[in-house]
A protein has these predicted regions:
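N-terminal glycine-rich phosphate-binding loop and ensuing alpha1 helix
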Residues: 1-70, 94, 130-134
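Conserved beta-loop-beta/alpha segment of the NTase-like Rossmann-fold superfamily
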Residues: 63-67, 74-165, 200-202, 208-211
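Catalytic-core segments of class I nucleotidyltransferases/pyrophosphorylases
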Residues: 117, 136-140, 167-255
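Short loop/turn motifs at secondary-structure junctions
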Residues: 39-40, 112, 141, 175
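Short, active-site-adjacent cap segments at secondary-structure transitions
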Residues: 51-54, 124-126, 247-249
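Residues at the starts of beta-strands that form the adenosine-phosphate
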Residues: 41-43, 88, 115, 144-145, ...
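Well-ordered alpha-helical segments embedded in enzymatic catalytic cores
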Residues: 27-31, 102-106, 224
């Protein structure tokens, strides 16, 4: 949640893009709820400057709660309290905006030696879907790392990372044999796009530490995953779960 939200200026000039409302709650709340629904209750949010509103949203406001209770506005009280009871939330600023890989690397101390999930705030997944639960199960079974994949029209693949895959007999997940960041339609290995959900083995941290800046001078998570996918030993291997449900891109005004 450390991006600048430039595509939604001027609305995001003084308010984080993650706090833009989707129906009756900010976009970031849907993402946190998705994590909690998948059994994840220790959540670290990587933020940036001018993003204090994210912390405030998930904090309690006793005066507001008392006022709603006294006014008999029980439905509103319940909706306010829901955001403050979603799990154990922690916050860490990214500092230098050096890309997604750098943001993930900032979580190293908090995560330690455990597999962990990365959920990008730009992607909202229908709450009726069990994508993250399926990804966690695939990670536990393979011992590697798992990315979420979604079919897109080939002419749109240049907006995503594209995956080369091969089937795994008897399993619903696939083996990812290669990743290409934002390829042209002609160079893309498939029309399977990487979307903003990852379940990663902690070995990714040591790979990220050795990953040089790539496109745009940023540390690309895709580059590190490519390296880890071709490695051997504990934590090696890259797999994908193909998502066929509804996804909304909060970074796209027309999504």
């Amino acid at each position: 949640a450390a991006g600048l939200g430039t595509r939604f200026l001027p609305a995001t000039k003084a308010s984080p893009k993650e706090m833009l409302p989707v129906v009756d709650r900010p976009a970031i709340q849907y993402v946190v709820q998705e994590a909690v629904s998948a059994g994840l209750d220790d959540i670290l949010m990587i933020t940036g400057r001018s993003k204090r509103a994210l912390e405030d949203h998930f904090d309690r406001v006793p005066d507001l709660e008392a006022s709603l209770k006294e006014s008999g506005k029980d439905d509103l009280l319940a909706s306010v309290q829901q955001a403050t009871a979603l799990g154990e939330l922690h916050y860490l600023r990214q500092g230098d905006p050096k890309g997604l890989g750098h943001a993930v690397l900032r979580a190293k101390t908090h995560v330690g030696d455990h597999p962990f999930a990365v959920l990008l705030g730009d992607d909202l997944i229908d709450e009726k879907e069990d994508l993250l639960t399926r990804m966690i199960a695939a990670q536990q079974k393979t011992g590697g790392s798992v990315v979420a994949l979604m079919e897109v029209p080939r002419e749109q693949i240049s907006a995503y990372g594209a995956a080369a895959v091969e089937p795994v007999e008897g399993e619903e997940y696939v083996r990812v044999t290669g990743l290409v960041e934002k390829p042209s339609p002609e160079e893309a290995p498939s029309n399977l796009a990487v979307i903003g959900r990852y379940v990663l083995h902690p070995r990714i941290f040591e790979v990220l530490e050795q990953t040089p800046p790539g496109r745009g001078g940023e540390i690309q998570l895709t580059d590190a995953m490519q390296t880890l996918g071709q490695a051997e030993g504990e934590g090696a291997g890259m797999y994908g779960v193909v998502f066929k449900g509804r996804r909304f891109d909060t970074g796209d005004k027309l999504s």
